[in-house]
């Protein structure tokens, strides 16, 4: 029963429902629909012409780009040639600069290396000088001083000193009768103290009377001509000493007659010979002095070049740094220009490709 009542009530409501009135803007809607139809018809009719115009514009842009590329090619070629010449010139200047720096570094290394080796290596002392014995003394003596020369010198500490005397003695009757005499050699310090002493007997070589006569007969012509003489040369290894503190400043040689006699030998000339021998390490360094100079200079040269490369690279390669900076700036400018051209081209394309057709919904919204 309730269901039937509901149905009857709904039917009565439908019968009593008031119809909706007509819209007030129905005229504007009709006008809008007609305008859209006209616009779409015009777009469809004019689209071939727009397509032709766009293709024409694209052809014009392509031709202009080709013309720009053709015009830019000689400038790029000229710029490339100038760049090649500039780089060649910078390369020559850089090579000259690097060569000059390397030569200066080599000279500096050689000077320092030779100086270091000269400071370490000790040259053996070799001295040969005349001695003059003072026969006014009871025992004639002669002194050789290391400060006598124009340039004073001394024996380095650690060297072995060998002192020798060379006596040129005539074969006179007095020297033959004397026979043996004593030779004393002393090393004196700066204060006059005796550092080392050596004394040994000396005598002429014995020659019998027949030998002397035969020799005189055979050598008569050279003796008369003055080419030969009747004399003997005696070399005496007098003293050997290890140099240490206090330092040696002079060498004194003294002639002492035989015991119970006062006759002294006759001398034509006397010489002193001093030779020093360094320790074996410094002796080896002295023998290989130039090799040490070469190797020390090479090591220093490598060290100087390494220091220049690590700490003073602009001094060694000044043109490279300036060239890299200029090239980087030019590259940045070119990149910026290319980006600007790409942005402008992209904007042009976006403007050309903007849609010129509006849909029906947007038009209806604009009118409403």
Curated annotation (Swiss-Prot):
Residues 346-359 have a biased composition (Basic residues). InterPro entries: Seipin (IPR009617). Pfam families: Seipin. It is a multi-pass membrane protein. It comes from the Eukaryota. CDD domains: Seipin_BSCL2_like. Its main location: endoplasmic reticulum. GO terms for biological process: lipid droplet formation; lipid droplet organization; lipid metabolic process; pollen germination; regulation of double fertilization forming a zygote and endosperm; seed development; seed dormancy process; seed oilbody biogenesis. Residues 344-368 are annotated as: Disordered. The chain crosses the membrane at residues 26-46, 101-121, 292-312. Expressed in seeds and young seedlings. Not detected in leaves. Keywords: Endoplasmic reticulum, Lipid metabolism, Membrane, Transmembrane, Transmembrane helix. It is found in: Endoplasmic reticulum membrane. GO terms for cellular component: endoplasmic reticulum; endoplasmic reticulum membrane. Belongs to the seipin family. Knockdown mutants have a reduced accumulation of oil per seed and a reduced overall seed size. The N-terminal domain (1-98) determines the lipid droplet size. Involved in lipid metabolism and lipid droplet (LD) morphology, number, and size. Facilitates the formation of large-sized LDs and modulates triacylglycerol accumulation. Induces probably a reorganization of the endoplasmic reticulum into LD-forming domains. This is Seipin-1. It comes from Arabidopsis thaliana. The gene is SEI1.
């Amino acid at each position: 029963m309730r269901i039937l009542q509901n149905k009857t009530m709904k039917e009565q409501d439908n019968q009593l429902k008031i119809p909706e009135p007509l819209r007030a803007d129905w005229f504007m809607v009709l006008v809008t629909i007609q305008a859209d139809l006209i616009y779409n018809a015009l777009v469809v009719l004019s689209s071939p012409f727009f397509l032709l115009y766009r293709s024409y514009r694209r052809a014009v842009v392509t031709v202009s780009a080709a013309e720009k590329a053709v015009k830019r090619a000689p400038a790029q070629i000229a710029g490339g040639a100038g760049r090649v010449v500039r780089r060649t010139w910078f390369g020559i200047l850089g090579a000259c600069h690097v060569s000059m720096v390397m030569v200066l570094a080599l000279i500096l290394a050689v000077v320092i290396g030779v100086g270091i080796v000269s400071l370490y290596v000790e040259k053996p002392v070799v001295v040969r000088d005349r001695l003059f014995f003072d026969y006014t003394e009871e025992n004639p003596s002669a002194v050789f001083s290391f400060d006598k020369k124009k340039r004073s010198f001394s024996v380095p500490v650690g060297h072995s000193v060998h002192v020798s005397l060379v006596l040129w003695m005539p074969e006179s009757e007095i020297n033959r009768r004397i026979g043996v005499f004593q030779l004393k050699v002393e090393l004196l310090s700066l204060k006059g103290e005796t550092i080392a002493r050596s004394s040994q007997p000396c005598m002429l070589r014995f020659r019998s009377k027949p030998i002397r006569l035969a020799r005189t007969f055979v050598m008569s012509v050279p003796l008369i001509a003055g080419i030969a003489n009747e004399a003997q040369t005696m070399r005496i290894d007098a003293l050997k000493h290890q140099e240490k503190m206090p330092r040696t400043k002079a060498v004194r040689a003294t002639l002492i007659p035989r015991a119970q006699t006062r006759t002294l030998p006759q001398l034509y000339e006397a010489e002193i010979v001093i030779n020093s021998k360094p320790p074996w390490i410094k002796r080896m360094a002295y023998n290989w002095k130039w090799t040490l100079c070469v190797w020390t200079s090479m090591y220093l040269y490598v060290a100087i070049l390494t220091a220049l490369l690590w700490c003073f690279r602009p001094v060694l390669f000044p043109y490279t740094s300036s060239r890299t900076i200029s090239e980087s700036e030019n590259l940045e400018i070119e990149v910026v220009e290319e980006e600007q051209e790409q942005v402008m081209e992209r904007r042009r394309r976006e403007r050309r490709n903007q849609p010129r057709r509006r849909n029906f919904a947007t038009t209806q919204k604009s009118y409403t």
